[in-house]
Each structure stands twice: as C-alpha cells, then as structure tokens.
Amino acid sequence: MKNKKPIFVVFEGIDGSGKSTLCKSLTEKLIELGIPSAAFTEPTNLETGKYLRKFLRGEIELGKEEQIEAFLNDREESLKQNILPALNSDKNVLLDRYMYSTAAYQSGDDLSPEMILKKNLNRNFKIPDLLFYLDLSPSIALERLNRRKEGKERFETLAQLEKIRSAYEKILPKDTIRIDGNKNQNQIVQECLEIFLTNIKSKS
C-alpha cells in the first residue's frame, strides 16, 4: 500500500507511559502493511542529541535557558537530517517526543510551558499531522520505570512526573488524540493504527 502524501505523527506522554514502545510497534505494523514509514526519537542520536542525553543522565548540568536552547538546536537537526528527508522520500514519520515534551519537561517557576512552546513555534518547526498523547497516572508510570533495568534519568520521580503531566495539560493542542495508557499494548497499537489509516485516506 502506498499513500500519496506521507504524514508526520508525534507521540507524547510522561516517562513510563508507553509512548516509545507504541511508536516502535506502530512503525513495524505499518511497514508490515507495506506503508513506507520511519521512526525517530528526540533527543536524537546526532551530536546535538548526545549532548542532551548527557544532561538527562545527570552527567552535565545546564541552566534552564541552556536546556531549552539545546533542545531547540537538536530539534532543528532532527527536522533537517531525519524528519524532512524521510517525508520528502514519501515515508510517513513517527516521532517519539517533540516540542510538547520540551515545553512540559523544561517548564518551571521562571518559564511556563506556554512560553517554552512559543519559543518552539517561533522557530517555525513543522506541526504534526497527528499528535497522540498517552495518558497514564504518574504513580503507575513510576512503577513501570522502577521495573526497568537501565539507570534512572533526572525527571523520573513521582513529583517530577506529576509536574510534567500537569504542564502537558496546559499546552497540548485541542486536536490532540488522547490514548488511555492503562489499556493493553496491543489494543493501543490497534487503536492508533485505525486512526492513522483513516488519516492517510483523508489526505490521499
């Protein structure tokens, strides 16, 4: 199956909500169906993203403005080197985290999530055609994170997850597709697949 116009899909949610697994699983499902698709993550695996991952692992410290600037720079590279080339080669792009994550995660007393989102929009970053938000209570998300073997990142505490979830609620667009993160993973993938297929039919 080949769609005439590829679409840009973004997955958002707090750590432990299942969005990374969903992004990967849905991409695999689309490829199985013969629908050209590519999955990417932010922070990227580019140099700009590696720098950010050092911060997330607590290996380096960055001030609030430095954090935001680093995320914006990585996003520019993400679009330039990953997202736009894939879309231009007729592949649908599925992205794990985007500008809404930066707005939710980097917000605080000095910078609101709305202000950070505006900084992203002022850069004219591409708006996604579909935005999925996996909603899950912070306590359940933290339980999932605690079961993982890899080391924790700096935002993986109950207080931080609650703050981030609250920030998401302030900046998610009205057309965001909310998915219940408590559902079975296969159910979630199927639900998102049906929404995706309906969307590409309407754009073809």
Curated annotation (Swiss-Prot):
Catalytic EC class: transferase
Function in brief: Phosphorylation of dTMP to form dTDP in both de novo and salvage pathways of dTTP synthesis.
Entry's family note: Belongs to the thymidylate kinase family.
Record keywords: ATP-binding, Kinase, Nucleotide biosynthesis, Nucleotide-binding, Transferase
A Pfam short name: Thymidylate_kin
UniProt-annotated binding residues for ATP: 13-20
Organism of this sequence: Leptospira interrogans serogroup Icterohaemorrhagiae serovar Lai (strain 56601)
InterPro entries according to UniProt: P-loop_NTPase, Thymidylate_kin-like_dom, Thymidylate_kin_CS, Thymidylate_kinase
GO biological-process terms attached to the record: dTDP biosynthetic process; dTTP biosynthetic process; dUDP biosynthetic process
Keyword Transmembrane helix belongs to the record: no
Reactions mediated catalytically: dTMP + ATP = dTDP + ADP
Gene Ontology terms for molecular function: ATP binding; dTMP kinase activity
Disulfide bond as UniProt keyword: no
Enzyme Commission number(s): 2.7.4.9
One term under GO cellular component: cytosol
Identification of the protein by name: Thymidylate kinase
